[in-house]
Regions:
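C-terminal active-site/capping subdomain that shapes the small-molecule cofactor and substrate pocket
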Residues: 222-339
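N-terminal Rossmann-like NAD(P) cofactor-binding subdomain of oxidoreductases
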Residues: 1-184, 219-221, 255, 268, ...
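A broad structural signal for alpha-helix termini and local helix breaks/kinks
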Residues: 142, 215-216, 243, 261
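Glycine-rich beta-alpha junction loops
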Residues: 36-38, 126-127, 151-158, 188-195, ...
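A glycine-rich, Thr/Ser-enriched phosphate-binding loop motif common to dinucleotide/cofactor-binding enzymes
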Residues: 120-130, 199-208, 313-317
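Oxyanion-binding "anion nests"
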Residues: 187-232, 238
């Protein structure tokens, strides 16, 4: 199939390139799309050189599938154009996530809602994906009343400029370009995305709204605090889950989570084994540990969740959505892949 990757030179786009090759996604024609300054250059992918195209050029080529990771403004304008031309669009921005009729997909949870008529598909927020991967199997067996989550988010979630700021500060360079309002090295910044009138940030409200939509249950209450930390390997989350009824036993929680595809239970504190972003980097699994009973409420448990935000939190989840479109027969598999 013809596949266009919009935002091919960004951090998520570069990881998408790797994931497509690693998972041997069937591509006959690869169409990288980037900003005007990159158009006309070449990009090496899967052993071949590919010309970087503009959005107009890519649209004229009528790709079967568009993986879009170029921000909400681009997505709002261009996703409908590609969809009207017959393309399936998997969008990594927040532009379409809460739109009625637009599916918000984590394939292990709700891929079944996709159809041949579903042309624009939203990829959830990175922090939301790893959270719902743990919540969903628990909620199915033991309905959840409320979730309180504090995130410890990698600078890679902001982009290359943030990684550059962190690396510059670690080298003692403090007069370079700033992706954040404050130094990030040796610091924690409780400010992910813009602040809203209710005192929460957009990132925190994404967790609030998206979790309910993916779980398909608006009764689940979610409150979040999102913090940027000087880490590159992935996002971490401290999560307090309160169940509607009696909480399941800790062995039952571990068993339920271990049976969830894509989730790895790493919960052996006695042997210093627990999830850490350093170990999650480059992996597609969601790691969960520090599973314990809350000491205040007898219906609550605590968890610690870690995942690579560029992979399962973005690129891998998008490619998994595309794989489902193929396996369901909505996208036709070519006989010979591109090289």
């Amino acid at each position: 199939m013809r596949l266009a990757l919009i935002g091919a030179t960004g951090m998520v786009g570069e990881v998408m390139q790797k994931v497509l090759v690693e998972r041997q996604f069937p591509v006959t024609e690869f169409i990288p799309v980037a900003s005007a300054k990159s158009v006309g250059n070449t990009l090496n992918w899967n052993g071949a050189s590919h010309l970087i195209r503009s959005l107009d050029e890519a649209l004229a080529m009528r790709p079967d599938l568009v993986l879009m990771s170029a921000g909400g403004t681009i997505s709002l304008e261009w996703a409908p154009k590609f969809a009207a031309a017959g393309s399936f669009v998997v969008d990594n921005s927040s532009a379409w996530r809460m739109e009625p009729g637009i599916p918000l997909i984590v394939p292990e949870i709700n891929a079944a809602v996709l159809s041949a008529e579903t042309k624009i598909i939203a990829n959830p927020n990175c922090s939301t994906i790893q959270l719902v991967m743990v919540l969903k199997p628990l909620h199915d067996l033991h309905p959840i009343e409320a979730v309180r989550v504090s995130t410890y988010q990698s600078v890679t979630g902001t982009g290359k400029a943030a990684v550059d700021q962190l690396e510059n500060e670690r080298r003692g360079i403090f007069d370079g370009p700033m992706a954040y309002a404050h130094p990030i090295d040796l610091n924690c910044i409780p400010h992910c995305d813009a602040f809203l009138d209710n005192g929460y940030t957009k990132e925190e409200m994404k967790l609030h709204h998206e979790t309910k939509k993916i779980l398909g249950d608006s009764r689940v209450q979610v409150s979040a605090t999102a913090v940027r930390v000087p880490v590159q390997g992935g996002h971490s989350e401290s999560v307090l889950i309160t169940f509607q009824g009696a909480r399941p036993s800790l062995p039952a929680v571990r068993q339920i989570l271990a049976a969830m595809p894509g989730v790895v239970v790493q919960d052996d504190p006695a042997n210093l084994s627990y999830p850490m972003p350093r170990n999650a980097e480059g992996r597609d699994e969601v790691f969960v540990g520090r599973i314990r009973e809350d000491l205040v409420c007898d219906r609550s448990i605590h968890l610690w969740i870690v995942s690579d935000n560029l992979r399962k939190g973005a690129a891998t989840n998008a490619v998994q959505i595309a794989e489902h479109l193929v396996s369901a027969g909505f996208l036709q598999t070519p006989l010979t892949p591109s090289h």
